[in-house]
Amino acid sequence: MNQVDLNCDLGESFGAYKIGLDEEILEFVTSANIACGFHAGDPGVMRKTVKMAAEKGVKIGAHPGLPDLAGFGRRNMAITPEEAYDLVVYQIGALSGFLKAEGVTMQHVKPHGALYNMAAQSRELSDAIARAVYQTDPELILFGLAGSELVLAGERAGLKTAHEVFADRTYQEDGTLTSRRQNDALIQDDDEAVGQVIRMVKEGKVRSLQGTDVSLKADTVCIHGDGAHALHFAKKIRRELRAADIKVQAFST
C-alpha cells in the first residue's frame, strides 16, 4: 500500500488578525508546520497551535520564514547563507520552547514561502539551512520541494529528508513550482488537485504546465489552510486518498 504524510502551514494568525481554520484543519492532517513569528504568528498563537496539534496527535514542525510580516514571507530578500542559518536556528529555538512546555517533540522543519523557494534553487542557502537544522537537532526531518537543492542539502548534512509535493500548485517542466505571480500558479478545481496528488503518490509523476511528465518523489503533501474552502478540500483529499488505497500517516511514523 502506498502511504503519504499530509501537512499544512498553521499558526499564521497574529495580533488581531485571524488567518486560517487551524483547529478544524488539524482533524485531517498528520503534520503541522507552525509559523515562528517572522512571516506570521506570535507567541500566543504559537502556544495555542502547539497545544491543539499535540492534543490531536498531529506531528509538529517549525516553519521558519523571512522577517517580512507585511509580505507574509513571500517576497525574496537578499540574505547571506549566514543570515539564513541565523534565521532558522532562531525560529526553531522559539518554537522549541513551546514544544518543551507542552511535553512534545519536534518532528521536522519546513522553510516558508520565499525562503523555501530560494533554498530550492540555491545550494549555498540550502546548505546553510540544513546545517542550522542539523546543529539544532540532528534527529529533525527536513521538508523540502521534491528533488530540490534543499532536499539534497539535507542529505549531505546527514538529515532525514522528506520530498514535498503540493496539492494545489502547478509545476514547471524542471520540477519547480509555478510562480505565484502567474495566473496559473494555483489549481482551482478540487478534483484536478486531488487527481494530481494521487498520481504523484502512486506513479511518482506530475504533468507540467508545458505538457510534459515530470518525475518526482512524494513523501509528504502540502495543503493550504488559509483559503476560502480549505476545510472542504482537507476533508475531500483525506477521503479520496483513502478511497485510492493510500494510507495517510505522519512521515516519522
Curated annotation (Swiss-Prot):
GO terms for molecular function: 5-oxoprolinase (ATP-hydrolyzing) activity; ATP binding. NCBIfam families: PRK05406.1-2, PRK05406.1-3, PRK05406.1-5. This is 5-oxoprolinase subunit A. Pfam families: LamB_YcsF. Its EC number is 3.5.2.9. Keywords: ATP-binding, Hydrolase, Nucleotide-binding. It catalyses: 5-oxo-L-proline + ATP + 2 H2O = L-glutamate + ADP + phosphate + H(+). The gene is pxpA. The keyword Glycoprotein does not apply. It is an enzyme of class 3 (hydrolase). Catalyzes the cleavage of 5-oxoproline to form L-glutamate coupled to the hydrolysis of ATP to ADP and inorganic phosphate. PANTHER family: 5-OXOPROLINASE SUBUNIT A (PTHR30292:SF0), UNCHARACTERIZED PROTEIN YBGL-RELATED (PTHR30292).
